[in-house]
UniProtKB/Swiss-Prot annotation:
It catalyses: a quinone + NADH + 5 H(+)(in) = a quinol + NAD(+) + 4 H(+)(out). The keyword Secreted does not apply. Residues 48-80, 90-119 form the 4Fe-4S ferredoxin-type domain. InterPro entries: 4Fe4S_Fe-S-bd, 4Fe4S_Fe_S_CS, NADH_quinone_OxRdtase_chainI. [4Fe-4S] cluster 2 binds at C70, C99, C102, C105. It is found in: Cell inner membrane. This is NADH-quinone oxidoreductase subunit I. The lineage of its organism: Bacteria, Pseudomonadati, Pseudomonadota, Gammaproteobacteria, Enterobacterales.
Length: 180
């Protein structure tokens, strides 16, 4: 080993230590996730939830449109009916290990029962734990649309009253009378 090689080797060691010293106290680009919350865009599509009406009843009417719209087929449900004729899902199941969070189920839902939230912390150790049942999906609030009530907007037959006679219900419009 010559003196020149020794000086070059020593110089590279000093240069390396100098570069480490420069970058050791610089501002870090890496965000420390649990301590610093991650910025999520306003329209971020995360975990799917089932919401309730402002009255507290389930919004889902088990129309099966969400399951049909799902491109990967991860939604399954079974329709049941109450004594007053209202439909509800007897069971509602989403397999999040197959879900691609595309949001097509939310767009297809006529009652805004299915909504995508900005929650993304869904990691599990076992694949079976990613199958969510209705009890896991149902939240206590109305979600993004707090004032929307499907049965008030769409109407539902009430025993003993004709269309347009119920409280907060508009009179029916004769659409054929609107033609020129």
């Amino acid at each position: 080993m010559t003196l020149k090689e020794l000086v070059v080797g020593f110089g590279t060691q000093v240069r390396s230590l100098w570069m480490i010293g420069l970058h050791a106290f610089a501002k870090r680009e890496t965000k420390m996730y649990p301590e610093e919350p991650v910025y999520l865009p306003p329209r971020y599509r995360g975990r799917i939830v089932l919401t309730r009406d402002p009255d507290g009843a389930e919004r889902c009417v088990a129309c099966n449109l969400c399951a049909v719209a799902c491109p990967v087929g991860c939604i399954s449900l079974q329709k049941a009916e109450t004594e007053d004729g209202r439909w509800y899902p007897e069971f509602f199941r989403i397999n999040f290990s197959r879900c691609i969070f595309c949001g097509m189920c939310e767009e297809a839902c006529p009652t805004t029962a299915l909504q995508l939230t900005p929650d993304f912390e869904m990691g599990e150790f076992r694949r079976q734990d990613l199958v969510y049942e209705k009890e896991d999906l149902l939240i206590s609030g109305p979600g993004k649309y707090p004032d929307y009530n499907f049965y008030r907007m769409a109407g539902m037959a009430i025993d003993g009253k004709a269309k347009g006679e119920a409280e907060n219900e508009a009179k029916p419009i004769d659409v054929k009378g609107l033609l020129p």
